[in-house]
Regions:
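Metal-dependent de-N-acetylase/amidase catalytic core
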Residues: 7-10, 17, 21-36, 123-126, ...
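Active-site rim/loop-helix segments in enzyme catalytic domains that contact anionic ligands
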Residues: 21-152, 292-295, 300-303
Length: 319
């Protein structure tokens, strides 16, 4: 047998015994595959996409986290942390919580854009000159472009422009800044001092499924428990019809839970919303994290009757 044929046979044998993401080709390619996620505050990385990142980590794909603010205006939602010393040092404590969550989830790097939390819409803090809401689009966008050009992600996840269910100024700004950076990072003519151009191949929005909320609500009712989901939340139009991508994160529910609990100032361990159902039941009820593919420079596999199951589809060898 020639070297070429024996080598091809070896690759075929290896590929047939390796799980998804782990063909010989993908073992090599995964080292250079990168996901970049952009979030507004510490704890957002845990409530949106943590299980996906943990799963990618276990398959050798690196993930980069960009957190835009320090969460200084966050309410203390855990009674055990509602103390004067915590309130006086909230910024430092939230940074420590973020560092813990980053390690639990498995992000390779954390970048802080350095803006101050703007607070909920209508608060005086919205108008502070150092708040994220007041940052110029170009200034904040350039910070993100520099990160994109340095880390060279193929996939980027950010927020939907429709934040009607939670119209926080910083969440709205995350969307605008992300779109700006996505559109300019690959343009060689745009500010070469920020690094060599890099075009992100796929841009997603993280999605909160109304169907998921309804499934959890119905299970609470079935078990005779008080549902944490309001009528307004259940009747919200949501964006389920826009969902293109559903990542099966069975086996990673605990990672998401532990990451949430790392944010002790923000997450009450007794919260029915987060932890009202037993872990195994909650994971079986909706074992997915949902996304909306917004822009793609890769070949997409999703269609009207086929949901994408992989953020990197079209970028990996699927044979």
């Amino acid at each position: 047998m020639s070297y070429k044929s024996s080598h091809e046979a070896l690759l075929k044998c290896m590929s047939s015994h390796l799980p998804r993401y782990q063909t010989y080709y993908n073992v090599v390619m995964a080292k250079s595959l990168t996901l970049l996620t952009v979030h507004a505050h510490p704890d957002d990385e845990s409530s949106k996409g943590a299980a996906t990142v943990a799963k990618l980590r276990d398959h050798g794909i690196r993930s980069i986290l960009v957190t835009c603010t320090g969460g200084e205006e966050g309410d203390i939602n855990n009674p055990a942390m509602d103390r004067p010393d915590v309130k006086q040092n909230l910024s430092q404590i939230r940074r420590e919580e973020l560092d813990k969550a980053v390690k639990i989830i498995g992000f390779e790097k954390l970048y802080l854009l350095g803006y101050r939390d703007s607070g909920m819409a209508g608060r005086p803090s919205n108008s502070r000159s150092d708040s994220f809401a007041q940052a110029s689009l170009e200034e904040a966008g350039d910070k993100l472009i520099e990160i994109i050009r340095r880390e060279k992600p193929q996939v980027m996840v950010t927020y939907h422009e429709n934040q009607s269910g939670y119209p926080h100024p910083d969440h709205l700004k995350v969307h605008d800044v992300s779109i700006y950076a996505f559109n300019h990072s690959g343009d060689a003519r745009y500010k070469p001092e920020l690094g060599l151009p890099h075009q992100v191949s796929k841009l997603y929005y993280s999605a909160w499924s109304t169907n998921r909320a309804k499934a959890f609500h119905n299970k609470f009712v079935e078990l005779g428990l008080k549902s944490p989901f309001s009528d307004e939340r259940l009747n919200r139009s949501g964006n389920d019809e826009e969902i293109t991508t559903r990542i099966d994160v069975r086996g990673y529910y605990r990672v998401r839970k532990d990451a949430l609990l790392a944010h002790a100032t923000q997450i009450d361990p007794a919260s029915n919303f987060w932890f009202g159902l037993p872990d195994d039941l909650a994971e079986d009820l909706w074992p997915f994290e949902d996304y909306i593919l917004v822009h793609s420079h890769a070949e997409s596999i999703n269609s009207a009757d086929r949901i994408e199951e992989d953020l990197f589809s079209g970028l990996l060898d699927d044979n």
